[in-house]
Amino acid sequence: MKKALLLMILVLLCLPLVFAAVAEEAQDITGRCEFIAAPASQGRKADMQDHSYLTYYTGKYLEISTPENAPCFGLYLCFAGREAPYRVDAWQDGAWVTAASDARQYANSFLPLPGIRRLRVVPDRNDTLSIAEITLLGEGEKPEWVQDWKPWQGKADLLVLSAHADDELLFFGGVIPYYTAQMQKHVIVCYLTDQTSCRRNELLDGLWLCGVREYPRMGVFKDIKNNSLGDSYGFWGEKPVLEYVTGLLREYRPDVVVTHDKGGEYGHGAHRVCADAMIKAIDRAADGAYLPNLGEPWQIQKLYLHLYKQNTLTLDWRQPLSAFGGQTAFDVAKAAFDCHASQRSNGLIVQDWGPHANNVFGLYYSNVGLDEQGDDLFEHIP
C-alpha cells in the first residue's frame, strides 16, 4: 500500500514537468501590433489581414511594433507580386540591426525570430515588397497551418506534372495526399505554366493541406488559353518545353511519373503538352548525349497518364487514411481545391466519377512490366 501511495505521489510530482515539456502553440499577436507604413506605400494593415490574396500592402519596408509583453518569435508572410529575398531588422540600441533573413524566394514564407518588439520587414534588393497576408506569432510552437516550406532534397519517388495550379487536384485527385502523407513517398509537384501571385499562394495552401512540405517546382511558361497541342507548342516553342520537362526528370530522378490525359481532359492545350512532352522526355532523359548540361541521365520506371485507356487502373480515394485522422484522400483533395478561391467561379469540382474521373489512370510506359493488381502506382517497384 505504501509503495503504491509513494508511486502515486511521484507521478503527481512529475506531471508539471511533463506538461512543461509540451510546448504551447504560439499565439497570433498580429491584431495587437502597431503597423507603420513606409513613405509612398500603398495598401493598409487591413489589406494584410482580410484573408484575401487579391489585396495587399506595397512599400519600401513595413515597420511593426508588438505589445510590451508580447515580442515576436515568428513571422509568416504571403507575398503578392514576384517573390524576392527579404530580411527582418530589429531596433537595437538606437539602430536597425539584421535579425533574420530569407533568400529562398518562397511565395509563402515563415521566418523564426528571437523575440523582437520592434521590427522592419525589408526587401534585400533595392526594391519594394508586396505583402498579401501577414501573421506575427508570440512564443511557442508554430501552428500547423503556418507553412514552413523546406527546399527540395534528394531523389523523388513520384513526380506529378500539372499544367496549372489546381489541376493537380481536379484531375489527379488523391494522388498527392495519399502517396505523400499516407504512403510516405517522396513526392515532387511540378507545374508547366507560370501563375499569378494569387494562384501561387493558393496552390501552396492546397499542397500544404495535402501533406506536402517541400517547396514545389513552379512553372516557367506563360499561361495561354487554347485547345491545340500545336498552337501551344507554337507559342512556347517545343524545344524549350522538352528541355524543361527532360530537366525535371534528370533533376528529381523519379521512379513514377503522373501527368495529364493525352487529349487534355476537356481539350486544354497545356494539358496536352504535359502528356506529349513527358512521353518524349522519357527517352531524352535517359540519353546521355541529349543536352548533358541538364544533368546525369535518368530512366524512369513508370509513366501514368490520366484517363489513358490501356493498362488502366482505378484508384480508391474513398478509404479512411490514418495520416489525415480518418479523412479520405478524396476529402483532402476536395478541401485542398477549396483553397483555390480564385477558381471557384469556373464550375469545376473535384470528382472521382464521370468523364474526367480523377482516380482513373493508364500505364503508358513501364520498365518493370505491366501492373497485375492494378491498385497502386508503385506496383513492381520496391
Language model: regions and residue ranges:
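Intrinsically disordered, low-complexity segments enriched in polar/charged small residues
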Residues: L7-M8, L204
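Active-site beta-strand->loop->alpha-helix modules in alpha/beta enzyme cores, enriched
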Residues: T30-E34, P39-G43, D47-L62, E68-C72, ...
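Enrichment for repetitive, rod-forming helical segments
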Residues: I9-L10, F171, Q351
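The feature marks non-catalytic terminal segments
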Residues: E24-T55, F79-G81, Y86, K150, ...
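Bacterial N-terminal signal peptides
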Residues: M8-P16
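Sec-dependent signal peptide cleavage junction
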Residues: V18-A23
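Positively charged n-region of N-terminal signal peptides that target proteins for export
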Residues: M1-L6
